[in-house]
Structures are given as C-alpha cells and as structure tokens.
Design a protein with these regions (language model features):
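Membrane-lumen (extracellular) interface motif
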Residues: 34-37, 118-125, 196-202
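Membrane-interface amphipathic/juxtamembrane segments adjacent to transmembrane helices
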Residues: 54-93
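Hydrophobic alpha-helical membrane-embedded segments
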Residues: 37-66, 104-114, 127-149
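Alpha-helical transmembrane segments and their immediate juxtamembrane interface regions
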Residues: 122-149, 201-224
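N-terminal chloroplast transit peptides
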Residues: 4-21
C-alpha cells in the first residue's frame, strides 16, 4: 500500500510539472533561469518518496527501525495475551487504540474540510496535494481502528488454534503499520503547505527538513 501511495504522489508531482510547463510564463529571474521552479517542487516530492523507499529496503535487509521494532512488540503483546488469557486487558488496550485512531481520522478530515475553503487562490495541483495527504492519513488511521476492532472480537475465539493466533498477530502488525502510515501522511502535509506558503524553494526546504526529522524518528528505540 505504501508503494501505491508513493506512486500516486509521484504522479501528482509529475502532473504539477506538466501543469506548470503549460501555464503562461512570466519573465524569469537570473536564479530561475538556472533552476526552474517546477523542478524544485518535483525534487522535494521525489526526496520524500526516495526516503520512504530506502527505509523499507533497509528493513527488508534486516535493519531495525521504530516501525519494525513496534511491529515485533505487537506480536509479543498478542502472545502475552493468549498465554495469560488476559481478555479484559486486551479489550481495554484495543479500545484505547481504536479511540485514538478514530479521533485522529476525524480530526484530519476536519482539518481537510477547513483548509480547502481557505485555498481559493491556490492551484488545483497544490490543493490536491494537501487533500491527498490528509485523505490518505485519515484513511489509514480508520483502517487501523477497523483492524483493532476485528482483533478484539477474535482474541478469545482464536485462543485454542495456533493458526488463528498467528492470524491475529498479523492483524495487529498490519494495524500498527497503518497507524504508522497515518502519522507519516499527516507529517507529509508540511510539504504541500510549505509549497503554498513559500513557493517551490520553501517546499524543498520542508522536504529536506522532514527527511532529517524522519531519520531521527525512525531509529529503533535503544534501552538507556
């Protein structure tokens, strides 16, 4: 799913390039004569996409990350619940997770509805960039909550079957990954917002700042 969403962003960035190339051009400054603004915008989007692809590639090669470590923690948590038959504990924990995810999804959709009304002067591509990030964030948060709800019904039923217990573990891992993606798409909103507020140069700066922030946040937790 992450690859499909990244591909959609790259397509949107390419559309932005074509749209900018087809619009009437004003007299370019000396700096713009060397670096076209649309190229700067596409570079910012490509930088974010490249970072995500590289992180996924490192994880597949065995490197630890926050996302990978937390996914393993979900598996350990499921096994603890099955071993202790802590159904009430599991339901309470899942309820907290469902509440958090649904709150985030509704908040993101509210922000999206409010922001679209304030972007009357922006281009269609800029508005679409903001809306796509917000919708992707809300969707992944809501899907994470859906899987948690499904796991809550399945926990006691799957206790006596090893194959079903493994299926519950996979559901919890997928729920965690969707929650992680929800936050990641919400952070990505900073890139089109910077594009709207400060132009292509600001969007590139925001893209570089986001990758530095992600590089810090994606490190695996280390016991002190």
């Amino acid at each position: 799913m992450m690859k499909r969403l990244i591909t959609a962003c790259l397509i949107a960035a390419a559309h932005a390039l074509l749209h900018a190339a087809s619009t009437p051009r004003r007299v370019a400054t000396r700096r713009e004569a060397y670096i076209p603004p649309q190229a700067v915008t596409v570079a910012g989007a490509a930088n974010l996409a490249f970072y995500q692809l590289q992180m996924s590639r490192r994880e597949r090669r065995g490197a630890d990350s926050w996302r990978k470590t937390q996914a393993a923690a979900r598996v350990d948590w499921c096994r603890h619940v099955f071993a202790t038959e802590g159904w009430l504990y599991a339901v309470q924990t899942l309820r907290n997770g469902i509440t958090a995810n649904t709150f985030q999804a509704s908040t993101v959709l509210t922000l999206g509805g409010l922001s679209v009304g304030q972007l009357k002067q922006a281009s269609h591509v800029q508005v679409a960039s903001v809306v796509c990030c917000l919708v992707a964030s809300a969707y992944t948060f809501s899907q994470s909550a859906r899987l948690m709800l499904h796991a809550g019904f399945w926990f006691p039923v799957a206790a006596g079957d090893a194959q079903q217990r493994a299926a519950v573990e996979k559901i919890m891992v997928r729920s965690h990954r969707l929650q992680w993606m929800g936050w990641r798409w919400l952070y990505h909103v900073a890139w089109p917002v910077a594009w709207l507020a400060g132009g292509p140069a600001a969007s590139l700066g925001a893209s570089l700042a986001l990758t530095l922030f992600f590089a810090r946040e994606d490190r695996a937790p280390v016991a002190s």
